[in-house]
Amino acid sequence: MFREKTEWSQLYWFNTDRKDLPRIMLIGDSIVVGHAPVLAEILANKASVAFFATSRIVGDPAYTRELMTAMADMPVDLIEFNNGLHGFHYDTEFYRNNLQMTLEHLQTSFRCPIRWRNSTPISTPDEPEKLHPERNLIVTERNLAAAEVMKKARVPEDDMYRLMLSHPEWRSMDGYHYNDEGKKVQAEFLAEILLKALAEK
């Protein structure tokens, strides 16, 4: 495996004492790290939130090991899954094939509904109004590949790329992340979708 200069993973469980509430597991990267606490606050007394976030791309053996560890301790009622903003040295075919294998692993390991959340736009550093010409192209290619995988597997998709695309005022200057308003918008978007999904479960 090719590695990024810094690899990282985070696991966080909110409201572990609330056994009476359904639990949502967010799987993603630093975008999840940004909006998960806001989502947990919005959903307080309605659902508990947990997240596993990592810099690893699907297909990295460490990704699956760490994901299974993250999911081992507590049952979850709904999974919101994303991967795609890391591992840019791997092509779209690698991403597609390993995303499909990871999805199949989640489906066989956890008997709960799974939703897919696509990846958010990447802008040019210090120019939030401009999409990054190379990296955002990779994001759109991966989002298309992921959409095909999810459609075939009948996994619903939540389009956060479109939500964030026309709002440079929500972007941080690093090109990847979002300011507090952007995180709030993302959390509100997911809260509505995920509560509805739980109600239909």
What do these predicted ranges mean?
Residues 42-45, 63-201:
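Alpha-helical cap/lid subdomain in secreted, periplasmic
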Residues 2-101:
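Conserved SGNH/GDSL esterase-like catalytic core that processes O-acyl groups on lipids
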